[in-house]
Amino acid sequence: MLSKSLTKTKLIDPLILTLLQNIKVQRSKLNDLNCIEVDPKLSNIISNEEGKELYIENEFYKAKGFRKLHIEVAEFSKSLKILHCVFFPDPKYDIPIFGMDLVKVNELVSAAIVDLSPSSKNQNLKYDHLLSHIDKSVFKSKREIPIWGNIFSKNVFFASLKNESEKNAFCKIVDNYLSVLIQLSQSTSPDSDYEIIEERINYQKNYCVQQMKNEKTSLVLLKYFDKVWVDEYIKKVLFDF
C-alpha cells in the first residue's frame, strides 16, 4: 500500500524535511486532492544489503488542474540523498510544470534546481515577471543548465548550496515558485480546444523525453538494479506520459 503522507520517511536530513514540509503545505491548497496508488514494487523500495543500502519512497497525488503530483525521497548507501518533485498539469489546463530536485552528498548540496517549465508555447509570458522578481542574489555557485535543458523557463534556478544561508534561501525560492504555481492553477479553467490540449500534451512528452537524457539518474539506479527495472522506474514513476 502506497504511503499517503511520507510521514514514515527514514530521511532525517533537516533541509530535505523542510523542503518536503513546505511542498506538502503548498500542495494542500489545491482543490480535489486525492492519492494515486501505484505498483508497490515501484513506490516503496528498501534494501539493507551491506554496501548497497537503499531507501526510496514515492508519493503520488492528483488534483484539479494536475494529472500527477509526484514526490520522491531517496537515500543511497547512507551518503547520497535526493528529493525529487514534479507536478504535471492536466493538459486541459493552462498551467506550467513545477519541477524541483535537491541532491546532497554527505553534507554537500551539489545540485538544487527549481523551475516552472512552460507546457505550451508562450505560456511563460504569463508568469515570467512573477519569478524574475524573486531574490536570488545570495547564491555564489550557480550552475550551468545541461544541453537538454531547453525545456526549462528562463527563470530556472540551478546552483550548488554552500552554506546555511543559501540552503534557507533555496527553501524560500521553492516556496515562492510553488506560490506562483498555485496562483496560476486557481485562475485557470479547463479548455476544450483540441489543438491547444494536444500542444500541451506534446510539451509534456518532450519534457519527459528531455529529462530522461539526464544520464546521472540511470547511472545511480543501475548500481542497485538491473536495466529493465531502471527503465521501467524512470518511464513509469519519474517521467511517464
UniProtKB/Swiss-Prot annotation:
GO biological process, one term: phytochromobilin biosynthetic process
Gene3D superfamilies: 3.40.1500.20
Catalytic activity from the UniProt record: (2R,3Z)-phycocyanobilin + 4 oxidized [2Fe-2S]-[ferredoxin] = biliverdin IXalpha + 4 reduced [2Fe-2S]-[ferredoxin] + 4 H(+)
Keywords: Oxidoreductase
GO MF: cobalt ion binding; phycocyanobilin:ferredoxin oxidoreductase activity
EC number: 1.3.7.5
Record's function text: Catalyzes the four-electron reduction of biliverdin IX-alpha (2-electron reduction at both the A and D rings); the reaction proceeds via an isolatable 2-electron intermediate, 181,182-dihydrobiliverdin.
Similarity comment: family membership: Belongs to the HY2 family.
Database matches in NCBIfam families: PRK02816.1
Protein name: Phycocyanobilin:ferredoxin oxidoreductase
The species this protein was found in: Prochlorococcus marinus subsp. pastoris (strain CCMP1986 / NIES-2087 / MED4)
